[in-house]
Amino acid sequence: MPELPEVETVRRGLELVTLKQPIVDVEVLLARSIALPKEPQAFIEHLRDRAIEQWQRRGKYLLATLDDGSRLVIHLRMSGQLLWLTTPQPPCPHTRVRWFFPTRAELRFVDQRTFGRCWWLPPDCRVAEAIPALATLAPEPLSEAFTVAFLAARLAHCRRSIKTALLDQSIVAGMGNIYADESLFLSGLHPTQSAHTLTPEQVQRLHGVICQVLREGIAAGGTTIRTFMSPAGVNGHYGGQAWVYGRKGEACRVCGTTIERLRLAGRSSHYCPQCQPLSSAIGK
């Protein structure tokens, strides 16, 4: 699933090419890709002839403000892509929604797994009411509101593993498997350590590392594991510099120990047994 750096990369790419241009037409090829309105034709009619004024990101959600005050919201989920095409091309097998712009340009929503969703929300609609998951998101981790005190308070009574806690969007908005593994490695924390056992010093270090890793991910254009690419069709490059994620069986870049992988709450976790000793997770 695209995480904060990937979604931010998409947002920045869309701002470069779609702003102030009227949407001349919309085509919905898979009805269930449209969450609201319930009828795809209504989705089409509300967006036709509108222009995008601004793109924002909230966690893993993309939000476009249109020139009439309405909103287009998109969640890429597991495999969604938003691709910008400057010349007409027939839709590929997994194309779900197409937005057409002047000069024959097209914004295309491609989604192999079909979990991605699009919403059109009228100007008087509260976004968090229409999409309840947005109401529970933590502050943006690269904003001033995401403080050490906030993170400490959320972890203080959390009995889950620290890896599982970091994936909770009410604790770190936009965090996913890749950057959680990277953050725990740089913090020296074993993924199975109970979140509530972290010391104030560990929480402070983890907070700083989360911000660092997410910024580095954005600077690298995100991570391409299977399907992610920017609107311009460019792959993300963070994977080539990853400390542990996706590197099972390879040598740790710090100490040379073999990177291991375990299953935790149904998710894979990559870690270095030497740099993230299991002893730090025992007896706490």
UniProtKB/Swiss-Prot annotation:
Q: Name one GO biological process term.
A: base-excision repair
Q: Which reaction does it catalyse?
A: Hydrolysis of DNA containing ring-opened 7-methylguanine residues, releasing 2,6-diamino-4-hydroxy-5-(N-methyl)formamidopyrimidine; 2'-deoxyribonucleotide-(2'-deoxyribose 5'-phosphate)-2'-deoxyribonucleotide-DNA = a 3'-end 2'-deoxyribonucleotide-(2,3-dehydro-2,3-deoxyribose 5'-phosphate)-DNA + a 5'-end 5'-phospho-2'-deoxyribonucleoside-DNA + H(+)
Which positions bind DNA? H94, R113
The record's keywords, sorted A to Z, are:
DNA damage, DNA repair, DNA-binding, Glycosidase, Hydrolase, Lyase, Metal-binding, Multifunctional enzyme, Zinc, Zinc-finger
Where do the catalytic residues lie? P2 (schiff-base intermediate with dna), E3 (proton donor), K60 (proton donor), R267 (proton donor)
| Zn finger intervals (FPG-type) | 243-277
In terms of Pfam families, this protein maps to: Fapy_DNA_glyco, H2TH, zf-FPG_IleRS
* EC number, UniProt record: 3.2.2.23, 4.2.99.18
Cofactors that this protein relies on: Zn(2+)
Cofactor comment in the record? Binds 1 zinc ion per subunit.
Which GO terms of the molecular function aspect are on file?
8-oxo-7,8-dihydroguanine DNA N-glycosylase activity; class I DNA-(apurinic or apyrimidinic site) endonuclease activity; damaged DNA binding; zinc ion binding
The keyword RNA-binding is annotated on this UniProt entry: no
Q: Does the keyword Zinc-finger apply?
A: yes
What PANTHER family has UniProt attached to this entry?
FORMAMIDOPYRIMIDINE-DNA GLYCOSYLASE
Quote the function comment for this protein: Involved in base excision repair of DNA damaged by oxidation or by mutagenic agents. Acts as a DNA glycosylase that recognizes and removes damaged bases. Has a preference for oxidized purines, such as 7,8-dihydro-8-oxoguanine (8-oxoG). Has AP (apurinic/apyrimidinic) lyase activity and introduces nicks in the DNA strand. Cleaves the DNA backbone by beta-delta elimination to generate a single-strand break at the site of the removed base with both 3'- and 5'-phosphates.
Assembly notes: Monomer.
The entry assigns this protein to a family as follows: Belongs to the FPG family.
The cross-references to NCBIfam families, in alphabetical order and at most eight, read: fpg, PRK01103.1, PRK13945.1
Q: This chain belongs to which protein, by name?
A: Formamidopyrimidine-DNA glycosylase
Name its species.
Thermosynechococcus vestitus (strain NIES-2133 / IAM M-273 / BP-1)
Could you tell me the gene encoding this protein? Answer: mutM
